[in-house]
């Protein structure tokens, strides 16, 4: 191969390893675009030449070798066919040529299908989409799973290809299929942080409540992997996207989800999907997509929207019905306010010890809640600023508030120490007061002990007297008592 060519090994798509490590698939491009055969080649040399033509994308040489009698479904050392290799690098023209020559689109190697290989290929979504469409047009089954029970739609979702996902569903792919770990396509998209795929799957009827084998739903998987925007979106109760395209026919779904680019090959369909921002995500979740243009015209950010008052809603042209949806969503997201008003009044001299103890216990519990809340926030905050997904004000504002919090906590600590010293002082004075009257509980306990001991003594004396009486009667039967 010419110097400077890129070299590498073609491996099975989707994480499936091949049965052999030394198959010698070279990925690269020769300096010469095309080669010509100079007469008949021996069988082994012909096979190597065919392999080289595939790796370099030499369509003319591939066609010439096929014309010379080499099988279109030739099996190389680790079992891959030419079509599987072409699909693994998303070479659309090579896939088309091989299919037109009769290559088997339903071939699999150890349950690794050509369609799975195409969905997990290295290449642009446009190329992958075209390859997948060609394979589906030759009746490749979109629901055959690999050894890990992963189907093509799961690989497409995992790798972030929303239009490939849509095309597979349009051809009958089961959107809620689960792999060996209970992951669905939606779970994979949430795990990898592919927002566009999550939205597309919800449109296609994906169930966001299906659990993995360890009991996690997609929103929890997103949270665990620090994809907080997806977590917040999936956590919303309202979801008008779900199932919007579920009842459409295959042709209607393809027409609605995919668009044809007239500037490129018109016989293929590929992606024209536009990414959503955090404001659009929030509005989509509430079924308020119609408000997007209105809010953008007025430069209203998500942060501003979430802090608006009722009069501001009306002033900005937001209807009462839409206001109710937004306020309802805010109630789901806001943290429950600490209700100190429920604590007992302690400023009264006649307060009982039980009431005062109850007050202290509630106060301690509220402090525990505050500590937990801060710990949760620390855990959820991204480590790096570029990972923040929502619009934030200046960090200086947050730092200033945190400084005030620290000051208030220090003041609280000082006051609690004063309270503790006062209670300790009162306790010491009471214990040293000679006029102190024991609590009724203490007196009752003491009296109970005296009565118990007296009763035992009387019973013991009576039993002893009874024994003595029996003994005397046996020895002196004539004596009467």
UniProtKB/Swiss-Prot annotation:
CDD domains: SAM_ASZ1 (cd09521)
Pfam families membership: Ank_2, Ank_4, SAM_2
Chain ranges passing through the membrane: none
Any Gene Ontology CC annotation: pi-body
Subcellular location(s) of the protein: Cytoplasm
Stored InterPro entries: Ankyrin_rpt (IPR002110), Ankyrin_rpt-contain_sf (IPR036770), Asz1_SAM (IPR042650), SAM (IPR001660), SAM/pointed_sf (IPR013761)
Keywords: ANK repeat, Cytoplasm, Developmental protein, Differentiation, Meiosis, Phosphoprotein, Repeat, RNA-mediated gene silencing, Spermatogenesis
Repeat region (ANK), residues: 45-74, 78-107, 110-144, 148-177, 181-210, 214-243
Chain positions with Phosphoserine modification: 17-18, 20
Low complexity bias locations: 1-10
GO biological process: cell differentiation; male meiotic nuclear division; regulatory ncRNA-mediated gene silencing; spermatogenesis; transposable element silencing
Annotated spans, Disordered: 1-23
Domain SAM residues, every copy: 272-334
Quaternary structure and partners: Interacts with DDX4, PIWIL1, RANBP9 and TDRD1.
Function: Plays a central role during spermatogenesis by repressing transposable elements and preventing their mobilization, which is essential for the germline integrity. Acts via the piRNA metabolic process, which mediates the repression of transposable elements during meiosis by forming complexes composed of piRNAs and Piwi proteins and governs the methylation and subsequent repression of transposons. Its association with pi-bodies suggests a participation in the primary piRNAs metabolic process.
Protein's name in the database: Ankyrin repeat, SAM and basic leucine zipper domain-containing protein 1
Biological source species: Eulemur macaco macaco (Black lemur)
Organism classification: Eukaryota, Metazoa, Chordata, Craniata, Vertebrata
């Amino acid at each position: 191969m010419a110097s400077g060519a890129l070299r590498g090994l073609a491996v099975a798509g989707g994480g499936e390893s091949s049965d052999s490590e030394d198959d010698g698939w070279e990925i690269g491009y020769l300096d010469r675009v095309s080669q010509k055969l100079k007469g008949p080649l021996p069988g082994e040399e012909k096979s190597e030449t065919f392999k080289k033509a595939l790796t370099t994308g030499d369509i003319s040489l591939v066609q010439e070798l096929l014309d010379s009698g080499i099988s279109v479904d030739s099996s190389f050392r680790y079992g891959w066919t030419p079509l599987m290799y072409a699909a693994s690098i998303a070479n659309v023209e090579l896939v088309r040529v091989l299919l037109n020559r009769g290559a088997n689109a339903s071939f699999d190697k150890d349950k690794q299908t050509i369609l799975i290989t195409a969905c997990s290929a290295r290449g642009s979504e446009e190329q992958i989409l075209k390859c997948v469409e060609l394979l589906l047009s030759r009746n490749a089954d979109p629901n055959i799973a690999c050894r890990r029970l992963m189907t093509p739609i799961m690989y497409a979702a995992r790798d972030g290809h929303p239009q490939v996902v849509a095309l597979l569903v349009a051809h009958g792919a089961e959107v809620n299929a689960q792999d060996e770990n209970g992951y669905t396509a939606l779970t994979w998209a949430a795990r990898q942080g592919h927002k566009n795929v999550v939205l597309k799957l919800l449109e296609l009827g994906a169930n966001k409540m299906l659990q993995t084998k360890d009991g996690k739903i997609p929103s929890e998987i997103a949270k665990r992997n620090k994809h907080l925007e997806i977590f917040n979106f999936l956590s919303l109760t309202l979801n008008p996207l779900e199932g919007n395209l579920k009842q459409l026919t295959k042709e209607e779904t393809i027409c609605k989800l995919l668009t044809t680019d007239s500037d490129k090959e018109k016989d293929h369909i590929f992606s024209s999907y536009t990414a959503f921002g955090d404001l659009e995500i929030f509005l989509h979740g509430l079924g308020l997509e119609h408000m997007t243009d209105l809010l953008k015209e007025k430069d209203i950010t998500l942060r501003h929207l979430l802090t608006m008052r009722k009069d501001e809603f009306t002033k900005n042209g937001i209807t009462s019905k839409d206001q109710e949806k937004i306020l309802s969503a805010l109630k789901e997201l806001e943290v429950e306010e600490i209700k100190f008003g429920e604590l007992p009044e302690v400023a009264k001299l006649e307060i009982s010890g039980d009431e005062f103890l109850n007050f202290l216990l509630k106060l301690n519990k509220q402090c525990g809640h505050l500590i937990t809340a801060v710990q949760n926030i620390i855990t959820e905050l991204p480590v790096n600023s570029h990972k923040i997904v929502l619009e934030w004000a200046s960090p200086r504002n947050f730092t200033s508030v945190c400084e005030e919090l620290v000051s208030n906590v220090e003041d609280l600590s000082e006051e609690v120490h004063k309270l503790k010293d006062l209670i300790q002082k009162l306790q010491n004075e009471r214990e040293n007061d000679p006029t102190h009257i024991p609590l009724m509980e203490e007196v009752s306990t003491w009296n109970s002990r005296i009565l118990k001991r007296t009763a035992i003594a009387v019973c013991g004396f009576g039993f002893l007297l009874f024994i003595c009486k029996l003994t005397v009667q046996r020895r002196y039967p004539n004596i009467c008592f």
